[in-house]
Amino acid sequence: MTQVTVKQLADEVKTPVERLLQQMREAGLPHTAAEEHVSDSEKQSLLTHLKSSHKAKVEEPRKITLQRKTTSTLRVAGSKSISVEVRKKKVFVQRSPEEIEAERQRELEERRAVENAARQKAEEEAKRRAEEEARRQPAPVAEPVAAQAAAPAPAPVVEPVQEAPVATAAPAADARKKDEQRRPDKTRNDDNRRGGDGERKNAPHRASVKEKAPAPRVAPRTTDEESDGFRRGGRGKAKLKKRNAHGFQSPTGPVVRDVQIGETITVGELAQQMSVKAAEVIKFMFKLGTPATINQVLDQETAQLVAEELGHKVTLVSDTALEDSLAESLKFEGEAVARAPVVTVMGHVDHGKTSLLDYIRRAKVAAGEAGGITQHIGAYHVETERGMVTFLDTPGHAAFTAMRARGAKATDIVILVVAADDGVMPQTVEAVQHAQAAGVPLVVAVNKIDKPGADLDRIRSELSVHGVTSEDWGGDTPFVPVSAKMGTGVDDLLEAVLLQAEVLELKATPSAPGRGVVVESRLDKGRGPVATVLVQDGTLRQGDMVLVGSNYGRVRAMLDENGKPIKEAGPSIPVEILGLDGTPDAGDEMSVVADEKKAREVALFRQGKFREVKLARAHAGKLENIFESMGQEEKKTLNIVLKSDVRGSLEALQGALNGLGNDEVQVRVVGGGVGGITESDANLALASNAVLFGFNVRADAGARKIVEQEGLDMRYYNVIYDIIEDVKKALTGMLGSDVRENILGVAEVRDVFRSPKFGAIAGCMVIEGVVHRNRPIRVLREDIVIFEGELESLRRFKDDASEVRAGMECGIGVKSYNDVKVGDKIEVFEKVQVARSL
């Protein structure tokens, strides 16, 4: 045993001697001087005191881990047995006797306090109940009740507190204490309910206590605890589960929801956001005077009124928020450079637009168009001696108004082609209006200048009426005489176009992501949806993720106007792209996006918005026309299933066909699409009693088989005039015919004779036309019809005559009419059926 002095110990622990002596005195050691010796046991006592003063544990509790292993055999069918081994692990922590004793004393005090409070509460309750019984019952009966109530309640039997084993876990004791605090009157209820023989007593007392403090609607506590104890092998000493974890608590007040309302919302969606049934919303709207259905689309103001009246908080959401966030993410950064102009060729039909463009391209394009008429937009990029120019060729027919308007929006300069021998026509004026509305400069090309009768001044004069003034007359529009056939003036036309482009200072950023507009789209049988896109800014590359209107996809391949594959396309370059999930509408904007998820979200959002707008428009149309259609005969409808080669032609045809008809007949395009006529199209035509029209497309084998079997009417066209004329003829046939009366002749009665066979015979002079025998007549007296019948007898000089002309006399016998007088007029007429027209 080594001993050190107090001074040496102070140097060792680096503490002043005076402080160490003070701590030793506090620990109960007899040391008072620095030279006194300190033994190992005294050091241990000092250390124990210091640890206890710093609230540190004297000794780490020792842990005892017990593992139990139980093996059993489970017999199954087939004389087989399965050996099941159950392993259980339990950890015991040794605690100090002082802590155990303190814990036991604390629990005992808490239990006594709870029992005293419960006893006092029970006595008060019994006394109160006895007083109520005394008030309700007569006086003789009140005495025994009062005596019984005055009897002291039996004292609760306090179970002897068993001494907790040394290996009891501290968390289990804490959980048991909290559980007893949660259930303060369990012991009292058990003692009051059971007597010495275990019989239940004081049932009215329990009922009154239960009525005073109703329990919340939760699952019984014993269920969780007992099942948990069963799973743990019957030992319920582990931490008990939390009570009331999933209990249903009814709301104390009305629940206010945050309802987000866009520009449109259906009744069902509004009810779902407010967490009410759709029937309640419909009932409330009915009270407001607005009948509705569960799928009816409400506008923002109506939905806001309904939600606020029902007590909810409304947040108005812009439907374009998703698209706005996408637009903000598209950044066009980089150096802007000059780009080639996009030139649209417009004009009246057959004025030579495609021939002029054909001469510039030095390729025969007009021969490929049916009838020499442009059916859809063609986009071509041309390298000239003066630079690159991109041309858009638009149709000149009246049905393609929307396509010309789109061409004007996507262009920089418009070449207005006017035939010198034909002058300004309706589509010429329309092209001028489109260009002026889009703010695009015009260059007038007076074509067919080589023909005799060409008058350039007449063209200038007619266009000046519509706000297009020639430079020669002091205006700002160049007029260039050209001949697409001979090539005269084409160089001057290109010079004027490029001069206008220099004035516009057209710029683009090739390093930015591609952005453009859809010129045309179609469905190719072997390649799927194909879209012709004019890149307006940035660069479009193969493999880019693009968003086009309500469609999206990755560019799998790009082709130029000659059908050759290319890897990228810069500004003002028209290309065909493959890889979209559908055929976009002509005029849709195309943009390159980096995130496929974002593109899909915006595309689906636009599709849903289109459906909602379409549904709302259809419902509004029903409500508006419901009273107009009452009392009217149902319109005759010509149903048509229309398939076209490209999207632009389909839209133009649908617009032209829907414009036909009148109050009695109408055209309804029940189905339309891009691509060939398929079996499903034939089935649709069969179900809707429709006519199949194919514009520049053909039917497949399955569709032809159905058409032959069912006798459907299917027609192919390649010129839009033929479709419109045939539909007009069909509608005219559906109109039926009108009955028209033609007055053949008029005879004036000069005298009246009597005949035993015919009665009164009128001696007449034919003053107008020809009087025919066996024709219907009218008898007019002072120009008022008094009889309508049939001419029975017509004679001249006692001879029967088939007809009598003007200026001759004759005798007329009217069938079943004898009241003919001198001065009457007999009008002979015939009824003719005349075909009606639109």
Swiss-Prot record:
Bias (Low complexity): 137-173
Presence of the UniProt keyword Magnesium in the record: no
Ranges for region G4: 447-450
Region (G1): 347-354
A GO term from the CC aspect: cytosol
Biased composition (Basic and acidic residues): 33-43, 96-136, 174-214, 222-231
Region feature G2, mapped onto this chain: 372-376
Keyword Nucleotide-binding assigned: yes
Domain tr-type G: 338-507
Biased composition (Basic residues): 232-245
Binding site for GTP: 347-354, 393-397, 447-450
Localization in the cell: Cytoplasm
Keyword tags: Cytoplasm, GTP-binding, Initiation factor, Nucleotide-binding, Protein biosynthesis
Coiled-coil residues: none
GO MF terms held by the record: GTP binding; GTPase activity; translation initiation factor activity
Chief location category: cytoplasm
Chain intervals for the UniProt region annotation (Disordered): 30-60, 94-254
Region G5, residue ranges: 483-485
PROSITE patterns xref list: G_TR_2 (PS51722), IF2 (PS01176)
Record-linked NCBIfam families: IF-2 (TIGR00487), small_GTP (TIGR00231)
Physiological role: One of the essential components for the initiation of protein synthesis. Protects formylmethionyl-tRNA from spontaneous hydrolysis and promotes its binding to the 30S ribosomal subunits. Also involved in the hydrolysis of GTP during the formation of the 70S ribosomal complex.
PANTHER family assigned: TR-TYPE G DOMAIN-CONTAINING PROTEIN, TRANSLATION INITIATION FACTOR IF-2-RELATED
Family: Belongs to the TRAFAC class translation factor GTPase superfamily. Classic translation factor GTPase family. IF-2 subfamily.
Protein name, UniProt field: Translation initiation factor IF-2
Source organism of the structure: Pseudomonas fluorescens (strain ATCC BAA-477 / NRRL B-23932 / Pf-5)
Lineage: Bacteria, Pseudomonadati, Pseudomonadota, Gammaproteobacteria, Pseudomonadales
Underlying gene: infB
